Amino acid sequence: MFTITRERELLLGHLDAQRRHVFGILEGLSDEQLRRPLLPSGWHCLGMVKHLALADEHYWFRCVVAGESRDYFPPEPDGEWQVGPDESAQDVFDLYRDEIRRSDAIITGTDLDAPPAQPDERWTSWGADFPDLRSVLLHMLTETSIHAGHLDAVRELIDGRQWVVVEQVSDRGLPQSS
């Protein structure tokens, strides 16, 4: 029987797999490599991790789902992508880990059908709708997967390393780790 508990476990399990992907693809890179922009847009790996922490985990779970204030966001344009020289790679990774821990507490303590505590008026202009935690989880799974893929491409440009994701599909159509 498929239950709400099982649904939450599946969604959170897949989100966790993508979060691990982010950490895994960056493992072994030097501080210089983590800060080196390789694409024309100018972002770098540490900036992506900070973006995942602030614009994704913090914003979607702490602000949207739990209703916390949005005044945490850096005031400068694209501030969530900026990593100062005084911020170490470990600081940025720890920030992301802390936001994941806080997000998980919100996810496990909130009903999947619960509406957002703090909807964002910008969603309409984005053509998006997030009526409940379930839709936010699906959005975050997509966002984190996309950004993990961006990091894959940059890592391959840095040193040729690739992150190969292999999943098998069970007879019920649910992905299972191999």
Describe the role of every protein-language-model region:
Residues M1-E7:
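Short, contiguous pre-domain boundary segments
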Residues R8-E27, D31-G79, D120-S178:
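Short, contiguous alpha-helical
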Residues E80-D120, D132-S145:
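Acidic/histidine-rich alpha-helical segments that form the ligand environment
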